[in-house]
């Protein structure tokens, strides 16, 4: 997993509350057994005027010119600014996969659905909770200024505006450690590889018949 320390990027304002995971990545795209290939269908029902299906050539589809991600000024955005209860609905981990593959590493909102919030950390993304009044202010600034950028500093736990204002956010120490060091569940396990090997050696001496059956 890619480590996260400080990110500076263009902000895309998604001015909608209660965006659920089916809107983030629709159910028809969940049939793949891979973790990749979802970014092209992020917010599919909103980005396109025709219905999408897995494996489709999106270059031939009808783009919705009114949807925020399709506007030229937000191309290359890597920070998503959203409204309350972002990521509600089903627990599909495909939602952060799609956001991440599209290019978003940071999502800022007044609140998140719990499972989506947890899944972001597991996939190298930083979900930041800021007061609704602050999000309102950032929304206005983003709409008013083309190319508006924010900086998310995980080490210091602050969001920094172009004019130098800083907004503090909370993050669990363990999750912060994992993001800063690029550790997913597998990475965390590998950190304990020596202890795991020691345990296996002890168990092989204590219960050798179990390991003989496994080898067979």
Curated annotation (Swiss-Prot):
Lineage summary: Bacteria, Pseudomonadati, Pseudomonadota, Gammaproteobacteria, Moraxellales
Pfam families: Aconitase_C
Swiss-Prot/TrEMBL GO biological process terms: L-leucine biosynthetic process
Top-level division of the source organism's lineage: Bacteria
Subunit structure: Heterodimer of LeuC and LeuD.
Function: Catalyzes the isomerization between 2-isopropylmalate and 3-isopropylmalate, via the formation of 2-isopropylmaleate.
Protein name: 3-isopropylmalate dehydratase small subunit
This protein's GO CC annotations: 3-isopropylmalate dehydratase complex
Catalysis: reaction(s): (2R,3S)-3-isopropylmalate = (2S)-2-isopropylmalate
Organism in which the protein naturally occurs: Psychrobacter arcticus (strain DSM 17307 / VKM B-2377 / 273-4)
């Amino acid at each position: 997993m890619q480590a996260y320390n400080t990110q500076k990027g263009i902000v895309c304002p998604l001015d909608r509350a209660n965006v659920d995971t089916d809107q983030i990545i629709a159910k028809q795209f969940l049939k793949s057994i891979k973790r990749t290939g979802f970014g092209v269908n992020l917010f599919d029902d909103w980005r396109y005027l025709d219905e999408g299906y897995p494996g489709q050539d999106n270059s031939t589809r009808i783009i919705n010119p009114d949807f925020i991600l399709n506007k030229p000024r937000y191309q290359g955005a890597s920070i998503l600014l959203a409204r309350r209860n972002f990521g509600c609905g089903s627990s599909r981990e495909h939602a952060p996969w799609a956001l991440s593959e599209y290019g978003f590493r940071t999502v800022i909102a007044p609140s998140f659905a719990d499972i989506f919030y947890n899944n972001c950390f597991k996939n190298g993304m930083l979900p930041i909770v800021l007061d609704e009044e602050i999000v309102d202010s950032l929304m206005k600034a983003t709409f008013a200024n083309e190319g508006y950028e924010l900086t998310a500093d995980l080490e210091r736990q602050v969001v920094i505006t172009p004019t130098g204002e800083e907004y503090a956010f909370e993050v669990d120490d363990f999750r912060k450690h994992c993001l800063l060091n690029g550790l997913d569940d597998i990475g965390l396990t590998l950190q304990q590889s020596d202890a795991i090997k020691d345990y296996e050696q002890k168990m092989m001496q204590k219960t050798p018949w179990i390991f003989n059956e496994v080898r067979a």
